[in-house]
Amino acid sequence: PIKSSAASDVYKRQYQYIVMDLEIELILSSLRNIISDEQEDFVASLPTFMQPYASFNILGLAGARSLDEVIEAVAGTAYEPVLRRCQKQYPPDGNTLRYTRYELALRTCYFSTLLERAKRETRGRASAELRELITMRAELMNLNTIYRMKTYFQADADRIRVTMLPFYSRLRPRQLEEMVSARDTQAFLKLLSATPYGRRIDPETGFFEGETDGVRYRATRRLLRFSTSPEVVYTAFMLLRSMETEDIVRIIEAVSYTHLTL
């Protein structure tokens, strides 16, 4: 009974990592739909199955028509002070929001919370392995952002810099700054090739996010197979399941898009 209870506690703690991720995606979806005024589509896509695990009322969020109503829907959660700070610093103009600033603040809250939990609830090697899982995801998200902004928007360094998550795994801050400041996509990829990710990401790829997903998948699978920590193994398992779901969604979206454009 003691072992069973301990295992249950581990699963409950690690499952919260996934729940928080989904909650933030819902809040960001709500903000995007306020900007684009597509509330009906948002309501239809709500994952109501997760309501028993969520820290706020999902349907309440679905009814939000303004930033104030989003904040009201998440009142009493860790997201409320984050959104209020953004609202004060970047006040909305009607339905117009500085979306990337809100996204950065929420994702920073997410990764900071995960790192604090890992430090508080694990020790030694298990803590280091959880930190690797968490910070690598943030770092690869930064690389994806740099690639997209340079490739599709020809964004300058200042515009990219303010979107960077403040977490590092295998890169040094100086290396990330050099890639942010690279003059174009090719210069960015050349700098990336000199980093620990260089041997794992094909610079000729036509699908950069697929390459970074592969890096994350292999690192996560390695910890799933070889870690001796229940917390790490379960977190790795949940993250792999999440990645598989993301892949399925991408395939469905690609097929739907192809069908619509034929």
Regions inferred by a protein language model and the residue ranges of each:
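Extended intrinsically disordered, low-complexity coil regions enriched in Ser, Thr, Gly, Ala
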Residues: 32-56, 151-169, 256-260
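Structured, contiguous alpha/beta core segments that scaffold functional sites
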Residues: 25, 33-82, 100
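Extracellular/lumenal glycan-associated surfaces
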Residues: 24-37, 140-153, 247-257
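An N-terminal, globular interaction/scaffold subdomain
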Residues: 5-35
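A contiguous, surface-oriented mixed alpha/beta subdomain in the mid-to-C-terminal portion of proteins
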Residues: 64-220
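Short, recurring structural edge motifs at helix starts
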Residues: 12-20, 128-136, 232-241
